[in-house]
Amino acid sequence: MRLTVRNIVSALLAVLSPLAFLLAQTPAQQPELPEFIKQGQQLMREGKLNDALALYRLNVQSSPHSTPANIATGMVLDLMGQGEEARKYFSKAIAVAGNPESQAAANRGMAISYAFEGNCDKAVKYEKRVLDFNKSTKNFFQQGEIADEAARICIDSGDFDAAYKWYKIGYETGLKEPGITAARRDLWSFRWEHAQARIAARRGNQAEAQTHVTAAKAILDKGTNPEQAAFFPYLQGYVAFYAGNFKEALEELNKANQNDPFIQCMIGQTYEKLGEKDRALEYYRKASTAIFHNPAAAYAVPFSKKKLF
């Protein structure tokens, strides 16, 4: 396929963010990334963020209107805790984007940048712009995904009212998809129950949280979305943690995705509550080295680094 800025931005996000639903393409359609992006990614995997940053900045200097170079630079700066500087590059990427898709990608990068600082309001401002793009393409599924991402940022930032609002928008919008299948309906229902359980747990409403956990399990047991089963131990561990049941939380979180920096961070928090400082630090170290630019890393990386230093 022809290599375009649009395709490069899409592939860049797909590699750096596991939740890269923006501009999603099938693997067969993914273009070859520019060599400097591949080199930077390898440096990041090796923990050499300074070297990756230098490489990306060099490319911005030589190609100041490169959307991928500006986005990549902003992502690395966020991971390094330099959000204000990162947003200069996301602003540039937004300004120079050559098409609506690339501009949406840059706006999403800006939203995640604010998530690294726990700023729900600012993140939502930019997620709304991405939502508007998906409205223009009448993509209801992507609208729901973006609304859920905004909600995730807000719950992790401690704004539970905003989180509830955006999760509800995500649920209701996702269901508007023309010709939606029963399985897709179940997916949105499972996500909505999952979200309500977490919000209730954070508000200290444990009985309500358990009601939603039970509802989520009932939907999961229908078997229409087997890939969602991996998210259930995370939910059980999350609810148990905020109920103060730390042994149960640890047991469940250990069944969740061990490569997710948010899960690593929660396991660290759980060990800390159990008085096992060394194990807590072990997991905080893991979480602090995440190289994703998504809500999970936006919460886990800054939180874990504060625990380590």
At which residue positions do the language-model features occur?
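Short coil turns that delineate tetratricopeptide repeat
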Residues: 30, 64, 98-101, 135, ...
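Alpha-helical segment of the N-proximal tetratricopeptide repeat
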Residues: 32-58, 62, 239
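Start-of-helix register in tetratricopeptide repeats
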Residues: 34, 68, 102-105, 145, ...
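Residue-level recognition of tetratricopeptide repeat
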Residues: 41, 75, 112, 152, ...
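Register position in tetratricopeptide repeats
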Residues: 45-46, 79-80, 116, 149, ...
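Canonical positions in the second alpha-helix
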Residues: 58-59, 92-96, 130, 170, ...
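Canonical tetratricopeptide repeat
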Residues: 72, 105-109, 142, 149, ...
